[in-house]
Amino acid sequence: MRQLKREVKIGNVTIGGKNPIAVQTMLNVPVEDIEGNVAQAKRCEAAGCQILRVTCPSPADAKCIEAVKNAVNIPIVADIHFDYKAALACADVGVDKIRINPGNIGDDDRVKAVVDACQQKNIPIRIGVNGGSLEKHILAKYGAPTPEAMVESALYHVRLLEKFDFNNIVISIKNSNVPRMMEAYRQLSAVTDYPLHVGVTEAGTYQMGLLKSGMGIGGMLLEGIGDTIRVSLAAEPEKEVEAGYNILRAVGFPVAGPEVITCPTCGRTQYPCTQIANEVEKRLQGCKKSIKVAVMGCVVNGPGEAREADIGIAGGKGEAVLFIHGKPVKKLTGDNILDQFMDEIYKL
């Protein structure tokens, strides 16, 4: 059962409540390269990104935020550290959300300046707690970035904003240790109704990042925790978007587009099952039809293992049985089984 949080509107996307889980990513082009950021932002939008974060180290870099904002039709989040004037500059150019830790931008007057700017334009603030950068007094208390330490840090920042009657807040509480990250989110979700941005930070190289994010983000979603997600990978941000949707699909959330399933193959396999599955997935990129497609290695277990698929094939030597909703329909034969199969998919 999903844990329902208060709704927060980020540009044209609303998270929290019963709204769909929003998939985010972050640009990784140097902020000085405005053309490169704009081009990458357009690719992310085409990949299905719903909320896009861009770093803004200084007030002058708000021009990159503005350029990206004008180039795409998805909400833009400014990632701010230390320089509160950068947050003010981003508010001036119409950013849709600001990610900040109020405790690292200076005294109360600076926090209030950011809060006032955001309140005037209805810009939400994400408090982004990271296990690698907790406040010294909290680390001294707990000795390590424990779940309790991260939750205390998050609530400390929340109170800084609430002190100025600001509650248009999203919270994230990330760690590179998956069990620690999951326990932190559990504890935080139990004590706040602000929507939660879920992710595993510093997840590692691409493959390990996929595994850790799948376990951490997917695990939280299965427990009903999370309103928006970002899969952090050492890869192009478009890959993060793809991974985010795959995690949502894997844990049972409705996601537009096809899902291709295939068996791992074994000694019974007599046709290029894996190659065909990969090619089917490639050809279906960009398809918005929500169908499950199965490419199975043999007729022994294939139809039964994929009975929940909308359409599939189970191959043999020089042929494949086409089945729809688990029931055999006809045989595909010859050298162009893949093309025949694709024709049948497009008929659905």
Feature roles, as predicted:
Residues 59-80, 113-125, 185-196, 280-282:
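Alpha-helix-loop-beta-strand connector modules within alpha/beta enzyme cores
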Residues 1-26, 119, 282:
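N-terminal amphipathic alpha-helix/helix-capping segment at the start of soluble metabolic enzymes
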Residues 130-133, 138-285:
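Catalytic alpha/beta core domains of metabolic enzymes, predominantly
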Residues 18-36, 55-57, 74-82, 138-151, ...:
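Active-site mouth loops of central-metabolism enzymes
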Residues 71-74, 92-98, 119-122, 189-195, ...:
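Glycine-enriched alpha-helix->loop->beta-strand junction motifs that scaffold or abut catalytic
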Residues 85-126:
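Hydrophobic or amphipathic alpha-helical targeting/insertion segments
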Residues 34, 45-69, 99-107, 169-178:
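Glycine-rich, proline-tolerant flexible connector loops at the mouths of alpha/beta enzymes
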Residues 21-27, 52-54, 76-80, 98-100, ...:
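Hydrophobic faces of well-ordered beta-strands that scaffold small-molecule active sites
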